[in-house]
Amino acid sequence: MSLIRGLISTIYYLPKIYKWFYRPYYFLSLLMTLAFVIVRCCPGLCEHLPSQREDGDSCAFDWREVEIFMFLGAIVMMKNRRAVTVEQHIGNIFLFSKVANVVLFFRVDLRFGLLYLTLCVVFLITCKPPAYMGPENIKYFRDSTIDEELQRDSRVTWIVEFYANWSPECQSFAPIFADLSLKYTCLGLKFGKVDIGHYGAVAERYKVNPSPLCKQLPSLLMLQAGRELMRRPLVDKKGRAVSWNFTEDNIIRDFNLNEIFQKYKKFSKGEKPEEPQPVLEEESESPLEEEEEDSESKKDK
């Protein structure tokens, strides 16, 4: 099922994926992924490679190499079951294909393995995935502005993402969060981001651990008047994040975005905001108090 879903998703986003390979990162990643296949099947190169096939054909895959490719496919399918975006699907394919290429090149020749491993290290250091540059309606906070901005208006609900640029999960989640900000931003609901890789003090104040071992990045916090109402993912007693998929549907459901948006939607049309909810609750309780006073007065009589 996961293989079929991934295949359908790839076909659906094929025009978008096609444009990615104009970018150096994705183009070079594709070459690194197909490196062993190119070397093994390219005339003029494959004739000089050793082979363990019975017929001695060095331009064809032996059975052990086929097994490694099959194992690679199984690992990619397992990892892509939790992938949310197309970027995550493609990233998993690139990552585990490079690992498989390292094993395959070392089987052929130690020198080829060391050369490919060196290329992978250089690529990892010099090439970074392109950051999301699409439309969004997000306010970026700094250490000195986040507390003041969150407490400025107690009627505004903030959905704040705590992220780090080095985190692949945060990079994959960026287009999802941007799309949500475009759909749900209104006068009473706003979206913000803070880079805890640069502002570690903010992470400490809001109890978000940036360590990769804790897997708390990205973290989404719902805040109102500077007070935390909800967060995802949740954190257990050991400080590790409880598994939670950062899909658009999960965020809309768990944070009640539809209800909050409908509540504040009329504010964006220029209507005067209503009184805060606590005042309305007090007004709704006042008739009950009057009834109790009337009953007590009747008893006294």
Curated annotation (Swiss-Prot):
**Which ranges sit in the Extracellular compartment?**
20-111
Record-level GO BP terms = brain development
Spans of biased composition, class Acidic residues? 280-295
The subcellular localization recorded is: Endoplasmic reticulum membrane; Mitochondrion membrane
What superkingdom does the record give?
Eukaryota
User: Motif Di-lysine motif residues?
Assistant: 298-301
Please state the span of the N-terminal signal peptide per the UniProt entry.
Answer: 1-19
Q: Which residues cross the membrane?
A: 112-132
Recite the UniProt keywords alphabetically.
Disulfide bond, Endoplasmic reticulum, Membrane, Mitochondrion, Signal, Transmembrane, Transmembrane helix
Q: How does it sit in the membrane?
A: Single-pass type I membrane protein
Task: Cite the PANTHER family for this sequence.
Answer: THIOREDOXIN-RELATED, THIOREDOXIN-RELATED TRANSMEMBRANE PROTEIN 2
**Subunit structure as annotated in this protein's UniProt entry:** Monomer. Homodimer; disulfide-linked. Occurs in both reduced and oxidized monomeric form. Oxidative conditions increase homodimerization.
Name by which UniProt lists this protein: Thioredoxin-related transmembrane protein 2-A
Annotated source species? Danio rerio
Q: What is the lineage of its organism?
A: Eukaryota, Metazoa, Chordata, Craniata, Vertebrata
Q: Which gene encodes it?
A: tmx2a
